[in-house]
Every structure is written in structure tokens, then in C-alpha cells.
Amino acid sequence: FEPTNEGYALAKVYAAKLCEYITNSDSTFSYKTIIPCNLYGRWDKFDPNNSHMIPAVIKKIHDAKLNGDKFIDIWGDGTARREFMYAGDLADFIFVCLMRFDETPDLINVGLGLDYSINDYYRAIAKVIGYNGEFKSDLSKPVGMRQKLVDVEQLTDFGWSHRTSLADGINNTYEFYKK
């Protein structure tokens, strides 16, 4: 496990194993484990002290635009890659699983199957918000893992794919944030 995510990863493995144990021990129970990639969307936390990357960047760029800031710092060099899926797409997947429960694999990753660099996310969010300033890499800040991307081969075989584009997801999230 990657050190900064070890506790989270172990908790997911433990929960999946518990579901597997219960399902195998008693035929009246049938559990499925869905492991999503990183999520963002409406009702997210936008407080920079306890938010995930996309809502934090939305707030950061929104504030920079309002304040007329010409520069925004990006932690690290911005080349690390992350996979973020709009939360509404996960809700859709869960609904599909309920409708096709017997076909749903016991354990399945849910994601886009593609990732973007941190720089790409900043540019996409700036475009939605209408921010025209520049981004500066703060190389004194940590980069984290170079890539976080889930394997979606089983998801593809199941016949499901996300519907929300990055631009639409960011726009939906930003519109919610402005309310």
C-alpha cells in the first residue's frame, strides 16, 4: 500500500473480506463490494481544511477570480495523475447494481478508467469558472503518488461506464458551490 493511504486501503480490504465471509457463511446474505475511485460533486466539502482536491481547487480558483489574483499556486509540479468521478455517476452505478444484483460481481472497482494530471484539473476548473490567471508550481509542497488509477476491466465487462464528462461534472459542482 502507498503509505499515505495505508489506513484507508486496509479498511477497504477488511470490509470487502468481511462481506465475502458473511456471504460465504450464510446463504441468506449476499453482499457486494463496490470500490470507487476518488469522487467529487454536489454536497462536497469545500472548506480547504478538510476537503478533497477538486472542491478545494474550485474554492481556490473561485476566490482567486473574485480577488483578482493573477497567480495560483499548485502543490508540487502538477504532473501527478488522479482519477476523479462525478458522484452522480456512482449513484447511477449503484442503482444499476440493484437492478442487476445477481449479475453484479462480488467485488468491483468503479471509475473512469482514465486519469488527468493535477495541472489538467486546475485548467479544467479555471475554464469553468472563467479564471484567466496563471498557475505556479510550488515545488516545496508534496506531490504524493505519481498516479492513482483503478482497473475498470471488470466494470467494462459488466457493461457500465460513467456518463458525466469532466467539464460537466465540474460545472455541476461549481453551480452547487455558488448557491
Name each model-derived stretch.
Residues N49-H52, E153:
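Short, hinge-like loop/turn segments at secondary-structure boundaries
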Residues V13-E20, I54-K59, A91-D92:
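Conserved active-site helix of classical SDR/Rossmann-fold NAD(P)-dependent CH-OH oxidoreductases
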